[in-house]
Amino acid sequence: MKWLKNLLSLLEHQLKTNNKIVVLGDFNIAPDDKDVHDPELWKGKVLCSDDERKWLKKILALGFTDSFRLFEQEEGLFSWWDYRAAAYRRKMGLRIDLILISEALKKSCVEGYIDETPRGQEKPSDHTPVLIELN
């Protein structure tokens, strides 16, 4: 949680001088139950704990938006699958890779999606790209 606390502090400072900010990467937090293949199974566990989600909500409360959720998305879209459980093949994923954009960029964001194409490679990552398009 220390990392999230430090990120929150950094973003508070950055927003004082720049209103166009993108924060992206592997947050290791599924923002909501709809970002988890089986919310009951993951309830309270790492990646889905109340504490982790609380810190993410604090960051969002600064004026950031989860860009993926700006657009209507079909259910069951994830960015990470555990190798140990053959989770990709079983559609047992979580959306833990996020692109957060500041309020000033919301109108510029015209698309947000997850590209599962790399998962078809011979030795893929356990994560797949999350992308946005800004105009």
Residue ranges with predicted function:
Residues 13, 33-135:
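Metal-dependent phosphoester-hydrolase catalytic domains
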Residues 1-18:
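A long, amphipathic alpha-helix that forms part
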Residues 3, 7, 23, 52-55:
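Amphipathic alpha-helical interface surfaces
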Residues 19-33:
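Acidic/histidine-rich, metal-coordinating catalytic segments
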